[in-house]
Amino acid sequence: RFHQSNREYELIDWIHEAGRLRAQGQLAGLVLNAGAYTHTSVALADAVKGTGVTLIELHISNVHAREPFRHHSYLSAVARAVMCGFGVAGYGLAIDALAQMQ
């Protein structure tokens, strides 16, 4: 299943849905590119932590080679893994990695 939204509340709702699916054994985990919310959203991190969902935090670019404010992530502390800098190919790599974690 794939979702895209620029609305933080929708991302939180989908994380909560993922938690329900995980509890039912229907979900391996999430690959999340939260964009700028990575650096600002305690709410997204709390949602992941509260659901216990396995998370791979994904960034298309190498955020550590960008502006200093992008070097901090609220999600990294609740993510099983962090991937960055692979371009859009990172999505496939992250899904493969998620499958290997199970």
Where are these regions (language model features)?
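Mid-chain, well-packed structural core segment of small domains
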Residues: G25-R66
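Short beta-strand elements at the ligand-binding edges of bilobed clamshell
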Residues: R70-V88
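Short beta->alpha junction loops
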Residues: R1-Y9
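A charged, well-structured terminal subsegment
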Residues: C84-Q102
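Short, well-structured alpha-helical segments in soluble
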Residues: D13-G25
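Hydrophobic/aromatic beta-strand patches that form the interior of the parallel beta-sheet core
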Residues: H3, V31, I56, A81-M83
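Short, hinge-like loop/turn segments at secondary-structure boundaries
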Residues: A18-R20, K49-G50, H72-A77
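Short acidic active-site motifs
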Residues: E10-W14, T40
